[in-house]
Amino acid sequence: MDLILCHQTADFDVLGAAVGLAKLHPGSRIVLTGGSHPTVRQFLALHRNEFPLIELRSVNPDKIRSLYIVDNQQGDRLGKAADWLTLPHLRQVAIYDHHLNSPRDIEADIWELEAVGASTTLIVEKLQRADISLSMVEASVMALGIHVDTGSLTFTQTTVRDVKALAWLMEQGANLRLIAEYADPGFPPPLQFLFAEAMQNLHKEMVRGYWLGSVLLTTENFVPGLSHLTERLLSLTECDALLLGHVYDKGKDKTKNDEQREKTGVISNQRFSLIGRTRIPDTDLTQLLEPYGGGGHAQAAAVNLRDVEPTTVMAEIYQALQRQIPKPLLARDFMSSPVRTIRPHTTIEQAQRVLFRYGHSGLTVVNQEEKLVGIISRRDLDLALHHGFSHAPVKGYMTRNVKTIAPDTPLPRIEAIMVADDVGRLPVMDQEKLVGIVTRTDVLRQLLQDKQEQSGRFGAPRSGSLRDRPTTPNQNFGQGSLLQLLKTHLPPATWQLLTTAAQQAQTRGWHLYLVGGAVRDLWLRHSQGAEKHQNITFQDIDLVVDGFHATADVGAGVELAQALQGDYPGARLSVHGEFQTAALLWHKDPQLDTLWVDIATARTEFYPYPAANPEVEASSIRQDLYRRDFTINALSIRLTNPNPGKLLDFFGGMNDLQSQQVRVLHANSFIEDPTRIYRAVRFVVRLGFELEPQTETYIRYAIASGVYERWRLTEHPTPALTTRLKAELSIILKAPYWKGALTLLADLDALKCLHAELKLTEQLWWQVRYLSRWLRWFDPERNLEHWLLRLGILLGALPPQEREKIAAGLQLPKATIDGLTNLETIETAIAKGLNSPASPKSSPKSSVIYQTLKDYDRFSLFLVAARGNKLLRKQIWFYFSQLCQVSPFLTGHDLKALGYKPGPQFKQILTDLLNACLDGELGDRQQEEAWLRTHYPLPNKV
């Protein structure tokens, strides 16, 4: 285990540097050795799961290999972790710091001390040189490290290197709004007294889930820098919007006009300025202050006034701000439901398996009366397992004093509770009944969705469940309803089918969704034009029914399919009860043509071991989309009320469509199912997209892990997996883009999914190219299975026994298996026949070529030609292009007419006659008859 040690009371610089080191050393863990700065603590309350943190008490010292220490050179700043520095089995200690004159007492193997403004800068430069990409949160926390330690690039120790590092982090996606929220550049002395007064007199109240603050300060003279003070108040008081009023006396600067106005009773020497800051979506301070002569931006504005009553003006603007605040998202709108629960007597080991199976980070605990009695997190379980209590009940480790929320708790309040109490999940209770749960991830997804909607970006609302607020269409999907787009792009009969299906689902109280490829292709056709995507025909439709776990024995999807068959009796129904799915197939229907509609019950999957068949159970639409392979395929459109036509995009699929990249949903996807590698390649090449970098990393790791080879060598490989692999190979090798797909598969080393030794060598490439040429010339009508021939070329590089094993495992046709198995035998026989003593070795007669090759099928001959030398290819080409077209003028009927008696001799006569024609000895019917009289004379009549 490699550990990255943060000093006690960690600030953003040490955290940012640690996060960067964790990227440089995959698998390493970050240890906060003794607490953190309050702002860091607040940051981690929301973003803890983004980083490989580990509790100090969960570390087993015996497994420590290397220690990386950031922003520190003193052992006493590491707390109890300082004891690890003297472990006898420790391989190395490395220190990265920017404090050149700091006291040091640690004996390290690697020292990197450089005079820059932040330790994070040193690590960023390493990341740049290694060409490592960062996520938004990773880039943001590292940018915070540089901002905090350089005073946002204003401190004297700031260097050009810090500026360049920060610029690179911005390119990596660092979020300025997140940085502004947590950066703390410090206060100038003149404002410190006013800040204390403002903190003491601040009025704060919650409105629609948002904290509003206001304070009125009075000074003798104008004080500069109050905008900075306002921003600091907004951050430290946890307000979402703040109005700061400042009343001051103009004093000696009064003009004669001011004195005249004062004599008339008008207060003219008093000035009033108001500064506003807001982080509340859809509020606009400029609109509020413009009527008073103010200006600025939606989130930051100010106004300077005179001749007014300050308290009155502040009250007016404060009330106007309240009216601007939008109705917030409530817990019921995005909570996950139903909640997966366990009993208090469930063992730690059992609870851990549940977490692993469903991908949760914690579980709620209920008693037999279904009342909430506790909650247990993955960290709690990890700690219990670390100490060997796998068989202990969870009731001894669960948190009993559970913080809960109500269904109508607004999102801002939920966020505040999570930060204040450092909790990652909040059960939703309705009159003591557990109705849902909101996790930290759910909140972050909603916040991200809000930010993207505010910035005008479309399509990455990383929301949490069926009840997440669906994304509304914008310019990328048109201003009209998605249903209208469906109606426009789908054939009328298919649109009517979807309408009927939605009506059937709605009468049963279910939600129905169009999911997957149809939604993806709808966007492609609409945004990029139907001309570019003429191959998109919408003949394969996927529907998902969220039946709320109804009809569990059959599945809501199956029941809906059966009902639809009643409306469409011409459809053929196929039911797969194990997976709670059904399919309706129309073949050359007058209206629907050839259409395949899959109807599934919303379900979740679990792979008990790599390359296994998934175990399936009913779930929600969110879980159903979460089990899919790629974000661009995890899109859905609701077809039923409420809000028909709303897009559900929980995982950023629209963003990836716009970025033209294929991103996998889960890190272990390719280990669970290798066919997803082939699907990823297929989508990349077919759509003209790219592999998202992290997805490519996951693919390469899965292949290098050897999991596929171990699966292939098992005594009984999973049949369903080989079927899926065969299907993907068939699609790829049949498609017009097969060359690009094969190139990418080879680059990823993904042919190892078939066999560990299979590589696309230059020789194989030439063979595939030769084969393609032959197929174009001699099988333009595609009577042969072209994909099988291309696969045959690849498998031909393996030993016959391995070749046969793979072909049999893929359940290829018997003739194909036999042809591949006997390929070398066929090649030897052909070579022997073409070099027989009956003909010169360099140029055998045409008849010899024909008679040698005629008994082999085209599949075998095409493979032999592609694999053979130039002379052999020339001979087989001659066979197909000319010799196969030769036939004598005389037939068996002609022989009978000429007086020959039918019998075994006929076959020999016709064969010899054909050979003579092939060798160019005969050219017309008369010559053939003369040849017969010479070589097969009729007996004289008596």
Curated annotation (Swiss-Prot):
Which residues take part in binding Mg(2+)? Answer: 540, 542
Annotated spans, Disordered = 452-478
Name the keywords, alphabetized: ATP-binding, CBS domain, Magnesium, Metal-binding, Nucleotide-binding, Nucleotidyltransferase, Repeat, RNA-binding, Transferase, tRNA processing, tRNA-binding
Q: What is this protein called?
A: A-adding tRNA nucleotidyltransferase
GO molecular function (one): metal ion binding
Give the source's domain of life in one word: Bacteria
Top-level EC class: transferase
Q: Which reaction does it catalyse?
A: a tRNA with a 3' CC end + ATP = a tRNA with a 3' CCA end + diphosphate
E.C. number(s) listed in UniProt? 2.7.7.-
* Protein family (similarity comment): Belongs to the tRNA nucleotidyltransferase/poly(A) polymerase family.
Deletion phenotype, per the entry, is:
Essential, it cannot be deleted.
The UniProt annotation places ATP binding at 517-520, 628-629, 633, 673-682, 686, 724
What cofactor requirement does the entry state?
A: Mg(2+)
Q: Does the keyword Nucleotide-binding apply?
A: yes
**Native source species:** Synechocystis sp. (strain ATCC 27184 / PCC 6803 / Kazusa)
Q: Which PANTHER family match?
A: A-ADDING TRNA NUCLEOTIDYLTRANSFERASE, POLYA POLYMERASE
User: What CDD domains has UniProt attached to this entry?
Assistant: CBS_pair_DHH_polyA_Pol_assoc, NT_ClassII-CCAase
Q: Which residues form the CBS domain?
A: 335-394, 398-453
**InterPro entries referenced in this protein's UniProt entry, alphabetically:** CBS_dom, CBS_dom_sf, DHH_sf, NT_sf, PolA_pol_head_dom, tRNA_nt/polyA_polymerase
Q: Name one GO biological process term.
A: tRNA processing
* Role played: tRNA nucleotidyltransferase involved in the synthesis of the tRNA CCA terminus. Adds the terminal adenosine residue to tRNA. Acts as a nucleotidyltransferase and not a poly(A) polymerase.
